[in-house]
């Protein structure tokens, strides 16, 4: 390795008695874009080691500050770059408040420029590091500057950045992606990732990369990952289409139409759509008979998440799935959905009325849409009934 740079640093320090500060942006770009060029990556690692670990050179340096995406690669022996203190999306203590915009900063910007904080919060909130809520600065600033919440994430990276790691599948990853799309959290062992993009050999490794890329957020205490906000959820939807994961993408893409037809009481459309979605969703996922009921209902009405806070009752052991759609505003009426195996739509509607589902609506007074769905295990068909009531 040619140590010309190192020698130059030593000579300058010796002559001028000045110490150096290095600021390196995207320090990991070679590892990310040339990951299979082992020779180049090794040469780059050696360059960094000679610059910053050599005792002769390090005595001439006050600070090295490098920013990037990937953590430092782990080696079978002691890391050649172990002289750095790392802060990443798994653990940024004690500088987490500088990783993104904190909530008080976002509120301040909204007040200054007369923007709707609740709308920005809905689109961009979700990253939490050591209890501190963080927002993506680019997305927040763009939305305030343009006075419109939109997907500004895709202006900074290509969709392949996401799909490359979603495409790893050992039979579990599709199930996990489906789970986080529905707003749930998935267990992940981040220690299985060796910080090496050439060694993505498990769903845990793939998920950990997505955490470092900010497509997933990470809860260190619970050791779970999740999609942080609405903007990133839209990125995953684009990725599903790009990957041609029809078994998930088709039900999601049809969910807006299903929601609209449900409000119209079009039971024929509801039954037909649920039948098709059951065929799509029952096969690929590691779900038992009862669990798949909830998945079908939630994905079938996926687009409604934009307008509703969806609460579900854990009733899978009873062979049914119960969901309460609580609107964020007064423009949408509440919707209560129950799906039950080997029943009738009338019986399901009666059961909705008997249960205390309406408690989740608080002091709401007005129209409520009830959707009762029965699933026949013999015919593999759905039958539905829609009823509008007044509270």
Task: Kindly label every feature range from the protein language model.
Residues 30-32, 73-79, 345-348, 378-385:
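Switch/connector loops and helix/strand junctions flanking conserved nucleotide-binding motifs
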Residues 1-289, 304-307:
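Phosphate-binding site recognition
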Residues 360, 366-391:
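Domain-level recognition of nuclease-like catalytic cores that cleave nucleotide substrates
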Residues 11-16, 300, 305-330:
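Active-site metal-binding core of divalent-cation-utilizing nuclease and nuclease-like domains
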Residues 41-47, 341-358:
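Mg2+/Mn2+-dependent nuclease catalytic core
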Residues 297, 321-325, 333-341, 355:
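Conserved catalytic cores of phosphodiester-cleaving nucleases, focusing on short active-site segments
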Residues 50-58, 208-216, 298-303, 351-371:
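Metal-dependent nuclease catalytic cores in nucleic-acid-processing enzymes
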């Amino acid at each position: 390795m040619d140590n010309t740079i190192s020698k130059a640093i030593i000579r300058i320090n010796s002559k001028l008695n000045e110490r150096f500060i290095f600021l390196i942006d995207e320090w990991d770009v070679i590892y990310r874009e040339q990951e299979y060029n082992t020779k180049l990556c090794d040469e780059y690692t050696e360059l960094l080691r000679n610059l910053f670990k050599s005792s002769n050179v390090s005595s001439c340096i006050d600070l090295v500050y490098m920013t990037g995406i990937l953590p430092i690669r782990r080696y079978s022996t002691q890391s050649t770059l172990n002289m750095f203190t790392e802060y990443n999306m798994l653990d940024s203590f004690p500088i987490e408040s500088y990783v993104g915009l904190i909530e008080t900063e976002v509120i301040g910007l909204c007040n200054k420029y007369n923007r709707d904080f609740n709308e920005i919060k809905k689109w961009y909130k979700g990253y939490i590091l050591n209890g501190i809520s963080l927002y993506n600065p680019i997305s927040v600033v763009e939305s305030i500057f343009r006075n419109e919440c939109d997907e500004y994430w895709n202006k900074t990276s290509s969709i392949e950045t996401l799909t490359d790691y979603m495409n790893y599948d050992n039979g579990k990853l599709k199930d996990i992606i489906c789970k986080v799309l529905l707003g749930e959290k998935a267990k992940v062992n981040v220690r299985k990732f060796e910080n090496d993009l050439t060694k993505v050999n498990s769903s845990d490794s793939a998920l950990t990369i997505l955490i470092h890329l900010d497509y997933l957020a990470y809860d260190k205490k619970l050791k779970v990952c999740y999609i942080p906000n609405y903007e990133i959820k839209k990125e995953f939807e684009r990725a599903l289409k790009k990957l041609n994961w029809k078994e998930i993408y088709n039900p999601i893409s049809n969910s807006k139409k299903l929601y609209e037809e449900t409000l119209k009481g079009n039971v024929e459309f509801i039954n037909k759509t649920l039948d098709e979605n059951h065929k799509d969703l029952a096969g690929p996922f590691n779900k038992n008979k009862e669990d798949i009921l909830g998945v079908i209902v939630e994905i079938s009405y996926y687009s409604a998440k934009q307008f509703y806070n969806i609460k579900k009752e854990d009733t899978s052991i009873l062979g049914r799935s119960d969901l309460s759609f609580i609107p964020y505003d007064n423009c949408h009426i509440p919707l209560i959905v129950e799906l039950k195996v080997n029943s009738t739509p009338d019986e399901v509607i009666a059961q909705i009325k008997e249960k205390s589902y309406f408690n989740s609506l608080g002091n709401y007074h007005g129209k409520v849409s009830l959707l009762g769905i029965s699933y026949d295990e013999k015919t593999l068909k759905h039958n539905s009934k829609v009823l509008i009531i007044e509270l």
